Amino acid sequence: MGRIENDNQDVSDDGSIIRVKLPNKRIREQFAQAELMLGSNHIRVRCSDGVTRLGRIKGKIKKRVWIREGDILIVVPWDFQDDKCDIIYRYTTPQVDWLRAHKYL
C-alpha cells in the first residue's frame, strides 16, 4: 500500500514523523534565538528581523519548557513597546534540524 503524506508532518531519516509549528505572520510571530539568560523569566533574544529584544517567558510554558542560550524560539513582539516580546514556543533539536533542512532558518 502507498504511504499517505500529510501537509503538517514530514518523515525524517529514521522514519519518525516530525511536526513543526511555524510562526504565524498575521499575529506578528517570528523566529528568535536566545542570547542571554537574565533571570526572573527574562531572556535577551535576537529576532529574525534583526532587533534584539527583552523576552518574557509566558506563564503557560514557564515550568514546562526549559529554555537555554542558543535555543530557537517563536516570539511575539509587544504592540506598545517594540523592544520587548513574549516567548511562546521553543523548538527541539529535531525540529531545528527540520527547519534548517527546509530553509526556514
UniProtKB/Swiss-Prot annotation:
PANTHER family: EIF-1A. Belongs to the eIF-1A family. Gene3D superfamilies: Nucleic acid-binding proteins. This is Translation initiation factor 1A. Residues 18-92 form the S1-like domain. PROSITE patterns: IF1A (PS01262), S1_IF1_TYPE (PS50832). Pfam families: eIF-1a. Keywords: Initiation factor, Protein biosynthesis. It comes from Methanocorpusculum labreanum (strain ATCC 43576 / DSM 4855 / Z). InterPro entries: NA-bd_OB-fold, RNA-binding_domain_S1_IF1, TIF_eIF-1A, TIF_eIF-1A_CS. Signal peptide: none annotated. GO terms for molecular function: RNA binding; translation initiation factor activity. SUPFAM superfamilies: Nucleic acid-binding proteins. Seems to be required for maximal rate of protein biosynthesis. Enhances ribosome dissociation into subunits and stabilizes the binding of the initiator Met-tRNA(I) to 40 S ribosomal subunits. The gene is eIF1A.
